[in-house]
Design a protein with these regions (language model features):
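Bacterial Sec-dependent N-terminal signal peptides
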Residues: 1-20
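Intrinsically disordered, low-complexity segments enriched in glycine/proline and serine/threonine
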Residues: 5-6, 259, 348
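Hydrophobic alpha-helix-in-membranes signature
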Residues: 6, 50, 88, 317-320
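Compositionally biased, low-structure terminal segments
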Residues: 6-11, 128, 283, 335-337
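Extended, histidine- and acidic-residue-enriched regions that form the cofactor-binding/catalytic faces
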Residues: 19-97, 103-111, 115-132, 137-270
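Peripheral terminal and inter-domain segments
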Residues: 269-362
């Protein structure tokens, strides 16, 4: 089904081009190793770090669209020097709806962003790891991260992430920035990129713009259009940026990331939710008008399906809940329908773009 495959083929930047790693790294970069080596290092005790930063999102006329991505890449390399973790490839697309009126800026839908995280974390977790940390370079990404963390908790998996609004990250900027107003392509963010990738910054185009600072909503460069007017796409005082400020902020921010990762490494794992009772009403055989058949079964605390009495792929593609009566897997979407008594009586199936109804056999 096309919608399900999008996160895998279009929404993730694997960053697999040849790179020179620091010889002092303690971390292992997943993209650099073979599957046999991955089998050795993806243990239950491993912490997997996932950098998340947009590679196509406006950051004013002076910064590149890849500003978030540049920061995510830099921070993952800083973390690699400090802790023996597994670092996954960087996610370069996500939920950034506030910037889509600026050419070159991209966003996914909320469900795509959330499911992208769930898909990748569940895939890696199947090999052992139950502790995940996202280096989150963004704010609009938080709702998807929060919901993904809540869902994964019920599966016995820890997901934690950096959040600029937490006091420890706010404190990282104290004593560095000269102007309080800001939040996007501002003094701090511009300073970060000046330090990390100075050749990509054109400070002659930097301006101080707080027109979009006063009220919530998406930004727009067009006067009289819906949303917050921000002619530059900047919220804050970009002209105050200096590479030295970026260096200091980066060091402080990395310290907070490492503290977070240490807490993930040592926290108690959640107890997975027992689904045996909740899923009981879905189990059984379903038949379609054209002879289609689907068996819904239960194994290892998860539901699985067998379509048209074909191969049993329960170990490969279990069903995951999207809502109370909606489940998804690699190729399918299932929506279960109940009668007035609350009993499951029908099943809507979307399989690789084909949609059909089935009735539960009594």
């Amino acid at each position: 089904m096309k919608r399900i495959f999008l996160p895998f083929f279009f929404l993730i930047s694997l960053s697999i081009s040849a790179q020179t790693r620091n010889k002092n790294n303690k971390a292992i970069f997943l993209e650099d190793i073979s599957w046999t080596k991955a089998k050795e290092v993806l243990t239950v005790d491993a912490v997997v770090v996932i950098p998340l930063g947009a590679a196509a999102k406006e950051h004013g006329p002076h910064l590149p669209l890849a500003t978030d991505y540049i920061q995510a890449e830099h921070y993952k390399n800083m973390v690699a020097l400090e802790r023996k973790v597994i670092i996954a490839p960087t996610f370069s697309y996500g939920l950034y709806p506030a910037f889509i009126k600026y050419p070159g800026s991209t966003t996914t839908f909320f469900t795509t962003s959330r499911n992208m995280l769930l898909d990748i974390i569940r895939t890696i977790s199947a090999f052992g790891p139950k502790r995940f940390y996202v280096i989150n370079i963004g704010v609009s990404t938080l709702p998807a991260l929060q919901q993904a963390a809540s869902i994964l908790k019920q599966e016995g998996i820890v997901l934690y992430y950096s959040d600029y609004a937490r006091p420890n990250y706010e404190n990282a900027e104290k004593g560095i920035k000269e102007r309080e107003a800001g939040g996007h392509a501002d003094e701090i963010e511009s300073s970060n990129v000046l330090f990390m990738r100075p050749e990509l910054v054109d400070m002659s185009k930097a301006v101080d713009d707080t027109t979009g600072y006063t009220r919530p909503g998406p930004l727009t460069p067009v006067p009289m259009a819906p949303g917050k007017l921000s002619p530059s796409g900047i919220i804050g005082f970009a002209t105050f940026a200096k590479a030295e400020k970026g260096k200091r902020n980066t060091i402080n921010f990395t310290k907070e990331l490492v503290k977070d990762i240490d807490s993930v490494a040592t926290c108690a794992l959640p107890v997975p939710k027992d689904n045996s009772i909740a899923y009981k009403s879905f189990l059984g055989n379903y038949t379609g008008a054209k002879g289609e058949s689907i068996e819904i079964g239960f194994d290892n605390n998860r539901m699985y399906y067998i379509m048209n009495k074909g191969r049993d792929l329960r170990k490969f593609f279990p069903l995951f809940p999207d809502s109370e009566d909606h489940f998804t897997s690699m190729y399918v979407d299932f929506l279960f329908v109940r009668d007035e008594k609350g009993d499951v009586i029908r099943l809507w199936c979307s399989f690789r773009g084909d949609n059909f109804w089935l009735t539960k056999n009594r």
